[in-house]
Amino acid sequence: MIQPQTYLNVADNSGARKLMCIQILGASNRKYAHIGDIIIAVVKEAIPNMPLKKSEVVRAVVVRTCKELKRKNGTIIQFDDNAAVIINQEGNPKGTRVFGPVARELRESNFTKIVSLAPEVL
């Protein structure tokens, strides 16, 4: 469950390291974002000499959450950190690599490009 003011790790090589969520896209009164949801975030920490700079506002899709996710078959999946992948306006990732595992629910949310770049899909 990601809410405004939540810090997330960046799971790609776009140049940012940490993001802070400032808004969840969808309904106007939405309080939480889960895996596969698009958020608007601000870059809080960035790698030097990269395209993304600190205090830049970006769109990102949540790929991992600490809050457990219950699937229809009864299994529960939980990650060690909150992480997101930065995307452009069309929904394609800005980076060329994705680090760490991602959830299978991203495929149902039409983020197949992120799923194909990920080293492991859980």
Curated annotation (Swiss-Prot):
SUPFAM superfamilies in alphabetical order: Ribosomal protein L14
Subcellular location as annotated: Plastid, Chloroplast
Cellular compartments per GO CC: chloroplast; cytosolic large ribosomal subunit
GO MF annotations in UniProt: large ribosomal subunit rRNA binding; structural constituent of ribosome
Known role: Binds to 23S rRNA.
Main location: plastid
Keyword annotations: Chloroplast, Plastid, Ribonucleoprotein, Ribosomal protein, RNA-binding, rRNA-binding
SMART domains cross-referenced by the UniProt entry: Ribosomal_L14
Complex formation: Part of the 50S ribosomal subunit.
Database matches in InterPro entries: Ribosomal_uL14, Ribosomal_uL14_bac-type, Ribosomal_uL14_CS, Ribosomal_uL14_sf
BP-aspect Gene Ontology terms: translation
CDD domains for the chain: Ribosomal_uL14 (cd00337)
Family classification: Belongs to the universal ribosomal protein uL14 family.
Pfam families membership: Ribosomal_L14
Gene3D superfamilies: Ribosomal protein L14
Annotated organism of origin: Physcomitrium patens
Gene (UniProt): rpl14
Name under which the protein is recorded: Large ribosomal subunit protein uL14c
